[in-house]
Amino acid sequence: PSFAPKSASETLKPTPAPAAPKAAEQTSDIEQEIKELDSIAKMMESTFDKPQNKEPSKPQSAQELKFVRILYKTLLDNEVDEKYINQILDEIEKFLRPGNSLDVILSNVYQKLILRFGQPETIKVNGKKPRVVFFVGPTGVGKTTTIAKIASKFKVNYNKNIAFITADTYRIAATDQLRTFANILDTPLSVIYTATELNSAVAEYEQADVIFVDTAGFSHKNETQRNDMRALLAGLSPEYEKSVYLVLSATTKYRDLISIIDSYKDIDDYKLIFTKLDETSSYGNLLNIKLYSDAGISYVTNGQNVPDDIEVFDTQKIVKQLLGGRQ
């Protein structure tokens, strides 16, 4: 069943519409809505941060239903796809019975969201050969800067031996940008122009722990560049461990994100990185794309500063924000 708020005809007794609502009445309705939402937010924060403070009160079924509809609206306002909201709320329907507290309902929604996101899948270094990490994605999402942030962590924080390869020869600025980062980190950089050059470039860095490969950003509508990217990924020798990270912007429209994901559907086992979280207040697309692609989210970025403005995806933090928690 859908948990979307019912229409007025379904939820309210018919009453004559006033010719002109009084300002005081309108203000009262708004204030009441604010109070309800604030009450929900406070209870959410209490549930997340202090789950054992006190025994929760037992609501009536009407309160439960209203609470679920507020949860529905909160997720919808965060741009979670309606079909995913209904799937989650369908699963917790069994908890909507007398005697269950609002905390129980909220806790189950919270857990369902946590399970759907799963755990972050970050870059692992565990072999004798270098791990070759490809970063792919559309133009303008901050792919090269993201590479620099992660590479800086491996070099400075984890004391790993790293190298750069760029196959992004469509944009001179991208190569220059990565070369600047390579110079700052005192890290070697190779530029390749075709997929056939990849293995010889990787072989030059046999002593590296991680080799970061920057690829050309392109429109998902550009079939030629898509084929070039596929050839590059397929061209790596199987003796090397490979990881692929699809970099997406959290500010991109949902419909466009779906088209981008569809254009990468023939790539096996890629992970997701979302950039520009600082430029949006709605995080629903992170859940939407995770569920649509079935790819794990690894990192998120929240600014331009290298290497600071990146972190491993924090599932609990994002879920709290999706449920109306304060950032």
Where are these regions (language model features)?
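Non-catalytic terminal/linker segments enriched in charged/polar, low-complexity residues
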Residues: 1-116, 121
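Phosphate-binding P-loop
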Residues: 123-130
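Hydrophobic anchor at the beta1->P-loop junction of P-loop NTPases
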Residues: 133-135
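Walker A (P-loop) phosphate-binding loop of P-loop NTPases
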Residues: 140
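Conserved lysine of the Walker
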Residues: 143
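Hydrophobic positions on the alpha1 helix immediately C-terminal to the Walker A/P-loop
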Residues: 146, 150, 177
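Short beta-strand-centered segment that lines the nucleotide-binding/catalytic pocket of NTP-utilizing
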Residues: 157-173, 191-196, 301-302
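Conserved catalytic-core segment of NTP-binding enzymes
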Residues: 177, 184, 194-204, 210, ...
